[in-house]
Regions:
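Hydrophobic alpha-helical cores of multi-pass transmembrane domains in eukaryotic membrane proteins
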Residues: 49-53, 82-85
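Transmembrane alpha-helices and immediately adjacent membrane-cytoplasm interface residues
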Residues: 76-96
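Alpha-helical transmembrane segments of multipass membrane proteins
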Residues: 29, 56-60, 89
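Hydrophobic H-region at the start of alpha-helical membrane spans
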Residues: 45-49, 77-79
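Conserved non-transmembrane functional hotspots
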Residues: 1-46, 72, 90, 94-197
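Hydrophobic alpha-helical transmembrane segments
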Residues: 64-82
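Juxtamembrane "helix exit" motif at the C-terminal ends of alpha-helical transmembrane segments
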Residues: 50-69
Length: 197
């Protein structure tokens, strides 16, 4: 690999890394949104169940002559009203499936970045193996990938990500080396007749 190709290769490595980060951050943000969506759905279900339960208990308490305690008969409707207000608040606060839609946007954007990441990885492999050695061809392919990357960002707004997603992505990319395939994984997954290890 000549010096000119090394410089281009370095630029491609940097773009690969940027796409890997964007891909994983978007995936992590999607996971965060889905967890929040499930949490909110569970809260709304709990609020509805408790509201219904206290309403039923209130009706039973009024009908059963054994309960003479006026304090209990007064407190149960107050609890029911409070739970009903909480349930209503949750319904208005967490609009219908907003977080689920945000998660879908993050996943869709991550998929585009993953595709681009794979293309960069293939180009890097072809250059390193010597399949592509001509600097002009490498520059042309680099520019095509840059155009694809620009188009991804031009087609839609980049979905919002949080610091929490960045931290989670950092641990996945740098801590567990999720973007690397180990020899053990290759031996376990790739059919024997296709392995070169």
């Amino acid at each position: 690999m000549n010096e000119q190709t090394r410089i281009i290769y370095r630029i491609l490595e940097e773009r690969y890394v940027k796409n890997a980060w964007t891909h994983i951050i978007q995936e992590c943000q999607a996971e965060i949104h889905l967890k929040e969506f499930i949490k909110q759905r569970n809260q709304m279900g709990l609020a509805a169940a408790l509201t219904s339960s206290t309403a039923i208990i209130s009706l039973i308490a009024k009908c059963v002559s054994l309960i003479d305690n006026k304090y209990i008969l007064l407190v149960i409707p107050i609890i029911t009203a409070g739970l009903s207000a909480w349930s209503t608040y949750l319904t208005f606060r967490f609009k219908d499936r907003v977080l689920e839609k945000k998660a879908e946007e993050n996943k869709h954007f991550a998929a585009k970045c993953h595709d681009l990441r794979n293309r960069y990885e293939s180009l890097l492999g072809d250059i390193k193996s010597g399949i592509i050695a001509d600097s002009a061809v490498i520059c042309k392919l680099r520019d095509e990938l840059a155009d694809m990357e620009n188009q991804i960002y031009a087609d839609s707004a980049t979905p919002h990500t949080s610091n929490k997603a960045v931290k989670l992505a950092r641990s996945r990319l740098l801590g567990s080396y999720e973007s690397q395939t180990t020899d053990e994984e290759i031996r376990a997954i790739v059919p024997l007749h296709l392995q070169i290890l």
